[in-house]
Amino acid sequence: MEEPICYDTQKLLDDLSNLKVQEADNERPWSPEKTEIARVKVVKFLRSTQKIPAKHFIQIWEPLHSNICFVYSNTFLAEAAFTAENLPGLLFWRLDLDWTIEEPGNSLKILTQLSSVVQDSETLHRLSANKLRTSSKFGPVSIHFIITDWINMYEVALKDATTAIESPFTHARIGMLESAIAALTQHKFAIIYDMPFVQEGIRVLTQYAGWLLPFNVMWNQIQNSSLTPLTRALFIICMIDEYLTETPVHSISELFADTVNLIKDEAFVSIEEAVTNPRTVHESRISSALAYRDPYVFETSPGMLARRLRLDNGIWESNLLSLSTPGIHIEALLHLLNSDPEAETTSGSNVAEHTRGIWEKVQASTSPSMLISTLAESGFTRFSCKLLRRFIAHHTLAGFIHGSVVADEHITDFQQTLGCLALVGGLAYQLVETYAPTTEYVLTYTRTVNETEKRYETLLPALGLPPGGLGQIMRRCFAPRPLIESIQATRVILLNEISHAEARETTYFKQTHNQSSGALLPQAGQSAVREAVLTWFDLRMDSRWGITPPVDVGMTPPICVDPPATGLEAVMITEALKIAYPTEYNRSSVFVEPSFVPYIIATSTLDALSATIALSFDTRGIQQALSILQWARDYGSGTVPNADGYRTKLSALITILEPFTRTHPPVLLPSHVSTIDSLICELHRTVGIAVDLLPQHVRPLVPDRPSITNSVFLATLYYDELYGRWTRLDKTSQALVENFTSNALVVSRYMLMLQKFFACRFYPTPDLQAVGICNPKVERDEQFGVWRLNDLADAVGHIVGTIQGIRTQMRVGISSLRTIMADASSALRECENLMTKTSTSAIGPLFSTMASRYARFTQDQMDILMRVDKLTTGENIPGLANVEIFLNRWERIATACRHATAVPSAESIATVCNELRRGLKNIQEDRVNAPTSYMSHARNLEDHKAAVSFVMDSRQQFIVDSGPQMGAVLTSQCNIGTWENVNATFLHDNVKITTTVRDVISEAPTLIIGQRWLRPDEILSNVDLRLGVPGNTSGSDP
């Protein structure tokens, strides 16, 4: 596809070529009329903001520079001199270079080629032949030298970054990117700092190597011998997951294996618990890597027994983890947050204390490297912050009911601190790979911080952050820091170059003309080149960098109120009547009269204003408006002063409208609307002042102050912005609704599967740690399988956890939906305000229709919010209260059993019995209260086998050893195949046997503590006595 050409540049070349062809009889210098035409053409180019593709740059350079030099040799205009001497810099300022992260070297080759083109021998010869300087700051020699030096430095930075990326363990270092950017933006490159190719180059380099900063911090922690082996191993896993997943590094695998060998066995759970699958994918990934001693193992192979890393709170007390890095074992930290939210235990208080210290360091950070180092060194990596943010959002937003929450009841100080770390960390990792002194980063920073504050606007108050508190913390570290001094220095250099050109023109006029010749000497401070260049650059400073340019009173003098000299009024009226679009400017002596300025403004600017406000705000209408606005701006710009800044206002309006004529126009925002409206009203005010200074009988009719009631342009402008805003809100809302719908369907499916799963029949097996599941329909003798009880509870807990995770996502989505509703309500108020203003005009229905659309939209969002709230409000999942009760009971029993196994004692065994007794009692009560219709409905559903497979997922079935055909279970303690001929009556002598399991549980304290249990040797002695074995007479009554 052929590259588009720059219209303004090509138009300048064509116009100058036509002037060159029209030269007759070697007329030198050119006539004043022809000179003025050339001045206007060059000035129009100097004001241009259009971009120049690289291919067009090469094609146009030689003929354009040649024609400008030719114009100067025939006119000696300051505009031509400035442009000829500084054309390389002016073109590089407008260069449209497509930088890519994949191949930045291609852009450097193009830059090298362009910098060589502008400094070829023919260019230097043309300048010297016309007595123009080759040493100007933006001229061929200077620009070639600076850009070549910058390219060389960029290549070094790119090579260092590439080497560091390819070999990060040996070549990457903290601060290397900052040093490279500082070198590329040092003072000697100040004059090219604002040029787009420099800005884009820095942006690409930052995105290319910005991730090396957190990587280096993690690598330093891995080599930190003061950290425990488990902590270092977890850092290795995290570093690989975030940065090295594609290419395994052998040396890191060896380092990981050596580190894992140093981890104490007590860091892992017992073998009995290890058979239970981990609850999360991340926990499975960590445990698998540690079990296989390979950081590139992401899951345990089926049938393989793997060690499982501990998550309990005790891991924080056993010197297994370094407390200075609480975020690196994120699963244990989340478990601690869930089990000890108040940080009341020893583990919780220790971790909370270190966490508060980390938060204080984060708040005291003043640069990106300080903030990222603090977070990464503490284990709060990108992934850790993401999980923490999700956890805190779930536990906090669960308390919100229709936008209100009692924060103290739902989040503790410990959770608040970690929530703040998660939010700040997420923002920091998002910004670190784009942080640079570029205009792009200014937009990225503003958009990212604003979007985050809107997304979590209901969460931030609960975290203790005041309005704007998150942005304040980020500003200290990541606020845009453009090099304002470089931009201001560039403006000074431009002024110096303009002064050189003006001095040369003034000298020429003084040498070749005298007062009687009628020559029009340029007035100091009012030259067209000064006005055009500074207007262009000052608008650029303001719009791109937010820098307010210095006020130059000489460039914007007030409109002259003095009456014209005797006899000139009629001449001025006659000349003013000739001014009409699209006539060319014809130089006349009356144009230099200060009292003629009101006539110029009252004709050209009034025509442009009247035409613009009558057009429609669409591509064709904007193009037509730009044509007449540019004509009004350029008419008489060589001699007519910029009174009241009218040309500056026209230039600003042109600059903001021009992008909307492109193939891919920018999004029309409220800021655009207010700026355009303000500029049009300012022009109307200036025109009104000028018209009031004209004689009464020649005053043109000035339209009323432009507004949506009398201006088609403004009415369609406001309507298009409101419609575009509604389109964006609707699109975002639809994406949220689709997400809500898909999540609700997933939750519904999971709940149906659980309903079918618990409707199945569960039967005991010889192994008391396993249970069988079969079809609930009695007529179908269909067994689905046998699983360990631990696996069953873990599978159900995983499903419930997945549903809770989906609800958390939906809660975050609700925050976004509330933001959309607030924006829609604001737009609705604007629509109603505009509808009121236009109620009696023809365009009234436009805004009433838009107001109705916003009203329906807002109501729809409210309906969606109320429906989604039903699923997300509260801690418990609607419809799954019984499942969560089951999981809580199971967790209490399992915890008691684990404690009794680890620390056997009478008290721990009694606790197990009490938990079992309470569980059985609760089950009996549940059976009495359970609705029979519900269970009957669930049992009559189909595909129970699919539900069991879905819930149990890939968990291995338990193989029950059925033993011999007689049913006896043979073990190392029992080798009896049949009990028919065995006399076991002696086992009942002097022994009290409880008849039922319920009695055992109810009498457990008495049986365990109050009764004496038979010892094995006493039982054996009794057996020997019965058998008549001599020598064994010991024994006693129980």
From Swiss-Prot:
It holds the Pfam family Herpes_UL37_1. One of its GO terms (biological process) is virion assembly. GO terms for cellular component: host cell Golgi apparatus; host cell nucleus; viral tegument. Its main location: virion. Keywords: Host cytoplasm, Host Golgi apparatus, Host nucleus, Virion, Virion tegument. Interacts (via C-terminus) with the large tegument protein/LTP (via N-terminus). This is Inner tegument protein. It comes from Varicella-zoster virus (strain Dumas).
